[in-house]
């Protein structure tokens, strides 16, 4: 970052421009989209989810798919994930991190604030013995008959 400060002094660039340059140079996000069109014929057959699986997922995730539109969205999300089957990973070593090929600029690991437990726990809907409590798993969900046909 020091080289950017020197650049600022040399060129007399105003602060917003310098910040924009800094963000662009240090960003790990590509500046241009990197996706490609997917050949749908190479994907596995679309997944259809039966009502028993829907009910099971709703109870596990506490998400109510509610109607055909909710189920369609779930199936579309699975279809999107199916694109991973098209990725050729032959000869590719598993990664430790998605950014392992980049030098990441990290701040020093120094505690800057402390004793903020109460402030953090104040954000929770429910706390037991200084732990966040997830919603209970016994939330009543609609029966199969209540779904749109």
Swiss-Prot record:
It catalyses: L-glutamyl-tRNA(Gln) + L-glutamine + ATP + H2O = L-glutaminyl-tRNA(Gln) + L-glutamate + ADP + phosphate + H(+). Residues 1-25 form a transit peptide. GO terms for biological process: glutaminyl-tRNAGln biosynthesis via transamidation; mitochondrial translation; regulation of translational fidelity. It is found in: Mitochondrion. GO terms for molecular function: ATP binding; glutaminyl-tRNA synthase (glutamine-hydrolyzing) activity. Keywords: ATP-binding, Ligase, Mitochondrion, Nucleotide-binding, Protein biosynthesis, Transit peptide. GO terms for cellular component: glutamyl-tRNA(Gln) amidotransferase complex; mitochondrion. Its EC number is 6.3.5.-. It comes from the Eukaryota. InterPro entries: Asp/Glu-ADT_sf_sub_c, GatC. Subunit of the heterotrimeric GatCAB amidotransferase (AdT) complex, composed of A, B and C subunits. HAMAP family: GatC. Belongs to the GatC family. Allows the formation of correctly charged Gln-tRNA(Gln) through the transamidation of misacylated Glu-tRNA(Gln) in the mitochondria. The reaction takes place in the presence of glutamine and ATP through an activated gamma-phospho-Glu-tRNA(Gln). This is Glutamyl-tRNA(Gln) amidotransferase subunit C, mitochondrial.
